[in-house]
Curated annotation (Swiss-Prot):
It comes from Shewanella sp. (strain MR-4). GO terms for biological process: translation. The keyword Membrane does not apply. The gene is rpsF. Residues 104-122 have a biased composition (Basic and acidic residues). Keywords: Ribonucleoprotein, Ribosomal protein, RNA-binding, rRNA-binding. This is Small ribosomal subunit protein bS6. One of its GO terms (cellular component) is cytosolic small ribosomal subunit. Pfam families: Ribosomal_S6.
C-alpha cells in the first residue's frame, strides 16, 4: 500500500456536514484495510482567490496509507459531491504522522492565550483592576 496526503475543501454552507463526510471517507479507507496516519479538520479558512464566488471554505487534511483503488474511489466520491469545491491527492514516500504547520500554529496560539484565553476581555480586566 502507498502513502497519500489528501486535502479537500468543502462549501462553507455545508460545514456542518463535514464530520459526516470525514466519517464516510475514513470508513472507505479502513474497509480496504488502509490506515489513517493523520486527520486534521482545519475549519473554515479564507481562500487565496474566489472559487464559485466564495471567499471561504472548510478545509480537511488526511494522511493515509491505502491501495490505489481506494484512492480512486475517494477521488470519484469527491468529484460527484457538489459540496467539495476542490481536492488534492498527493502520493508521499513515507507516512506523515506529525502535526501539520497549520495545526502547530493553532496550538501555539491556544497556548499563548493561557488560562485567560477562555474568558472575555472585560472579565480579565475586571480581575486586574480589583487587585
Amino acid at each position: 500500500m502507498r502513502h497519500y496526503e489528501i486535502v479537500f475543501m468543502v462549501h462553507p454552507d455545508q460545514s456542518e456536514q463535514v464530520p459526516g463526510m470525514i466519517e464516510r471517507y475514513t470508513g472507505v479507507i479502513t474497509e480496504a484495510n488502509g490506515k489513517i496516519h493523520r486527520l486534521e479538520d482545519w475549519g473554515r479558512r479564507q481562500l487565496a482567490y474566489p472559487i464559485q464566488d466564495l471567499h471561504k471554505a472548510h478545509y480537511v487534511l488526511m494522511n493515509v496509507e491505502a491501495p490505489a483503488e481506494t484512492i480512486e474511489e475517494l477521488e470519484t466520491a469527491f468529484r460527484f459531491n457538489d459540496a467539495v469545491l476542490r481536492n488534492m491527492v498527493m502520493r508521499t514516500k513515507v507516512a506523515v504522522t506529525e502535526a501539520s504547520p497549520m495545526a502547530k500554529a493553532k496550538d501555539e496560539r491556544d497556548s499563548r492565550r493561557g488560562p485567560a484565553g477562555d474568558r472575555s476581555y472585560d472579565e480579565a480586566n475586571a480581575e486586574e483592576i480589583a487587585e
